[in-house]
Curated annotation (Swiss-Prot):
GO molecular function, one term: calcium ion binding
Catalysed reaction, written as an equation: a 1,2-diacyl-sn-glycero-3-phosphoethanolamine + H2O = a 1-acyl-sn-glycero-3-phosphoethanolamine + a fatty acid + H(+); 1-hexadecanoyl-2-(9Z-octadecenoyl)-sn-glycero-3-phosphoethanolamine + H2O = 1-hexadecanoyl-sn-glycero-3-phosphoethanolamine + (9Z)-octadecenoate + H(+); 1-hexadecanoyl-2-(9Z,12Z-octadecadienoyl)-sn-glycero-3-phosphoethanolamine + H2O = 1-hexadecanoyl-sn-glycero-3-phosphoethanolamine + (9Z,12Z)-octadecadienoate + H(+); 1-hexadecanoyl-2-(5Z,8Z,11Z,14Z-eicosatetraenoyl)-sn-glycero-3-phosphoethanolamine + H2O = 1-hexadecanoyl-sn-glycero-3-phosphoethanolamine + (5Z,8Z,11Z,14Z)-eicosatetraenoate + H(+)
Name this polypeptide is given: Group IIE secretory phospholipase A2
Tissue distribution of the protein: Highly expressed in skin and uterus, and at lower levels in various other tissues. Expressed in hair follicles, specifically localized in companion cells of the outer root sheath and cuticular cells of the inner root sheath in hair follicles during anagen. Expressed in white and brown adipose tissue.
Required cofactor names: Ca(2+)
Disrupted-gene phenotype: Mutant mice show abnormal hair follicle ultrastructure characterized by defects in the companion layer, the inner root sheath (IRS) and hair shaft. Mutant IRS cells have large cytoplasmic cysts and pyknotic nuclei and are devoid of keratohyalin granules, whereas the cuticle is abnormally dissociated from the hair cortex and medulla, indicative of impaired hair follicle development. Mutant mice are protected from obesity and hyperlipidemia in response to high-fat diet.
Sequence positions that bind Ca(2+) 2: 41, 43, 130, 132
Amino acid sequence: MKPPIALACLCLLVPLAGGNLVQFGVMIERMTGKPALQYNDYGCYCGVGGSHWPVDETDWCCHAHDCCYGRLEKLGCDPKLEKYLFSITRDNIFCAGRTACQRHTCECDKRAALCFRHNLNTYNRKYAHYPNKLCTGPTPPC
C-alpha cells in the first residue's frame, strides 16, 4: 500500500530553526517569490505590533495574522516561539506538529502566506518600512 501524498510530502519537511519566524519566512518566500524581509515592517501590521487601519490588502493579511496569533495566545500557546512541521507543494502548504499549538501556529502562518500570494498585486513599496506614526484611523477588531 502506498502512503498518502500528504505523508510523502511530510518527508521533505523544512528544518526547524529558532522559533517559527524562519519557518514563516520560508512559507512567504515560496508562496510569493519575494524575500520575507520585504514583509517585515510593511504597513501598519506587518512586523512587531500593529494598530490603526491597515493600509492595503497586504496589510490586512498581517492584521488577520496578528488576530490569529492573539487567539492562540488566549489558548495558552506561544505562537512566536512554536516550532512546527510543514511541507510545501507548488500551490499549497501542509501543516503538522506534535502539539495542537504547533499545528494551529502553522495554520496561522499558512493563511498569512497564502493571503500574501493572493494579494501580491496590492504590495506597494511605499509601505515598506512604514513609520507607525503615519498609521491613522481606528484599529479594526479581530
